[in-house]
């Protein structure tokens, strides 16, 4: 089997797409289309994977499956992931470093743990809301 076909078969198996390889794209669910998009992005083993809201259109179970798969893939391959997302639970789970943006400007950055400690919050959603509301750490009630 040629290298490209082996890689397609490998990714199809990993992303649970084997039974869908001959199905037209119009017959795929949102979750299946997301997994196909991941396979297409990973076919050449990139060192950096760019993802924009990768689970936004997915049901909770499928979104969780995709996040788990991405965690495993990153750990096994060493591929860096640049993630754009409004889903702070996803960001907290998948990211080592976070840039918080407001109107296209970086207003804070750090590891999820560092941002949580800096803002005295329990989850990044609260940090995100504080930043969106323009509240600095000093303005947040204890």
Which role does the model predict for each range below?
Residues 2-20:
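Conserved ABC ATPase "signature" region
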Residues 45:
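Conserved catalytic motifs of ABC-family nucleotide-binding domains
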Residues 49-52:
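Catalytic Walker B motif of ABC-type/P-loop ATPase nucleotide-binding domains
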Residues 64-76:
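Helical segment within the ABC ATPase nucleotide-binding domain
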